[in-house]
Amino acid sequence: MYLLTINYSLQCKHYTKSNKKLYIAKIMTEFYRAPEIFRQNAIIVKKSRRDISDDENSTIVRRNCKIEASKLNSSLLRKVSGDLNDVIVTKKLKTDCWKLSEDTRDVTSMSLDRDTILLSTSQTSDNLQLFQLRNNEINEQARGGKLLHSLQTITVPGKSILATDIMQSQNNDTVVSFDDKVHDRILLSGHSDGYVNLIATSIENGNAKILRRFNHSKHLKVITDSMDSVDLATQIYNTSRSKPIRHLKTWNKHHFTSVINDSLFVYDVNQQCKDPLYLNSFPGLEHVDVNPVNPFTFSLTGTKFGQSGIALLDLRLGDGNGIRVPGPQDSNAESGKCYTSKWLDEYTVVNSVGKALKIWDIRYGKVRAHLLGHNGHVNSLDYDNEMKKIYSTDDQGLIMSWDIKDLKFTDQVMCCRPSHGIQSFGLPADCVQNGNIIQSPDLERIGNKKHLGSHFVGLADSHFISLQDQELRSYSVVDMPMVLPPPRNPLRLLESVSTETKSEPPATMVYSSSDETTKDSSNSAFEDSEDTLEYEAHSPMTPALDSMFDGKTHSFDIPTIPLLSGIRRGSDATFVCEGL
């Protein structure tokens, strides 16, 4: 677990008193810190003095330590060392920031694949832009530092692009129409008129080309919401009705999933007939995520899936009844507002319900943990399988990470809260503090409604990427050596004094109260916690673009493809297959 907390610096002053040099470390904080965070004694020291008649100057100190076993495993405690040269290597959070140019404005989507970033804009030209993150080889001392390279821009004709995705490089060879001698990347772009383009390009040479186009709208038909109304299924599709691609994701090598309104599509890009392999409509559908082990199991989230806000879909059941909603359902209860979900493993999935997160075990259909810490509605989730961390973002711009590596699920529902901040005070004893704030919300941005909704996040090669108002940020966890100042121990000071003044009689020890010892230990544990992380941002935040690859602009024409008329269906599961 790592924390994003305050920075501090040490300033040392010394003075001479009775030919004895003493050093005092004064801690200067940049931000406000609540005093005496740890109010309970981790170690209780009892001092006793026994008078010896033979030597009145002798002092004997007996210490009895009562250690509570439950506090020894706390991540907020560290081992106190008396070594002046004590150094530990701790994990800290490093942030790289870039201010994108004015050409990258009105961003509509962001997709990631390892170190490649694809942005789409609402402009008519240069509406696809490719970037790449690379290690900073020039400045080796910049631990975890990254450089942002602008690769190329692509102009895709047609309506505005609303969704994008990058196919993984290892799956390129599974696409029949892909030529690896010319191209090395496959992109997907979803437009506001229901079209999805399969695009091939080269990172170095460009030569972007549309391989295939998929028209979703021709497989839909119009029906009215009222059961008493006349069925309009046989009428021509209503072109004025909105049909944007709201979700687009590659699936199972050479397949992809997409969502229009409430309808879920599954396509095979190698199939000669451009009809979907699967089409069904789910009222209130917002997001789809694929099981990482079983690719035929989907998690569906939406605003009309009951209190749980999530449902499971098994594509292997061909009768259309593969949908299952976990948990008890109350027909009179209001449906949860769920906008996203993410699989953690084969049997565990997390979804958002309003301002809270729920971790489900699909084998039992029960909630195992609640993650509470957001003040706004959670609209994005990502999971780092290597570090076992969940990243969540709400509509106010708050980004949090949840460490679930040490969570042990039981029959009782666990409650997880932030480990720092106002919400970390006054929590019950059974509450797990594993949430960390990555980025706090910008109050000025929240007040400006014009910028709301322009926040995109994603996970790429263990780097958490955030895009907000043309500011791109990369968060990474790096190993950072940290010097630990030794505690102010009276025995250590007494030993140094007795070394310099051997001829003088031994000084009588001055006892400090148990409260003072507890205060020093608690402050040291808070300020130099082993898991404390430092927030670093480049200032001023200017783009660090490498001139190795100049921005390339590639325009191309759409191949002549006949547009087929069809009928639209808004809430049923069938589709019309028309021959090409």
Swiss-Prot record:
Stretches the record annotates as Disordered: 497-534
Protein species of origin: Kluyveromyces lactis (strain ATCC 8585 / CBS 2359 / DSM 70799 / NBRC 1267 / NRRL Y-1140 / WM37) (Yeast)
Task of the protein: Involved in cell wall metabolism and required for the separation of the mother and daughter cells.
Keywords: Cell cycle, Cell division, Cell wall biogenesis/degradation, Repeat, WD repeat
WD repeats: from-to residues: 102-141, 170-209, 222-261, 333-370, 373-412
Protein name as catalogued: Protein DSE1
Biased composition (Polar residues): 510-526
Family to which the UniProt record says this protein belongs: Belongs to the WD repeat DSE1 family.
Protein's GO biological process: cell division; cell wall organization
Domain of life: Eukaryota
InterPro entries xref list: Quinoprotein_ADH-like_sf, WD40/YVTN_repeat-like_dom_sf, WD40_rpt
